[in-house]
Amino acid sequence: MKTFAIYAATALAEIAGCFAFWAWLKLDKSVWWLVPGMAALALFAWLLTLIESEGAGRVYAAYGGVYIAASLLWLWVAEGKQPDHWDISGAMVCLVGTVMIIAGPR
């Protein structure tokens, strides 16, 4: 459960940081959006180091599924665009992969 909470916080930090750049470049927001965006991206990188694993690549691979699902949640909550059934199905496949990577016997 702790691992999932860290992955969820990591996804929020990364998506918020990337959205700050999106807002600046695509939505004509102030360049000052980059200040919290950069802080969020630094937090994202730090949070990934808190995951217990013998390899960074495995952490990043497992995180990928969480990121995909969290991005679709962001699309819905922050941007007001509801994911379609293809989005949801794709995210579920990725989350199955995440569980296999995290819980697989080593």
UniProtKB/Swiss-Prot annotation:
Pfam families: UPF0060. It is found in: Cell inner membrane. Keywords: Cell inner membrane, Cell membrane, Membrane, Transmembrane, Transmembrane helix. Its main location: membrane. The chain crosses the membrane at residues 4-24, 31-51, 59-79, 85-105. GO terms for cellular component: plasma membrane. SUPFAM superfamilies: Multidrug resistance efflux transporter EmrE. It is a multi-pass membrane protein. Signal peptide: none annotated. It comes from the Bacteria. HAMAP family: UPF0060. Belongs to the UPF0060 family. NCBIfam families: PRK02237.1 (NF002586). This is UPF0060 membrane protein Plav_2230.
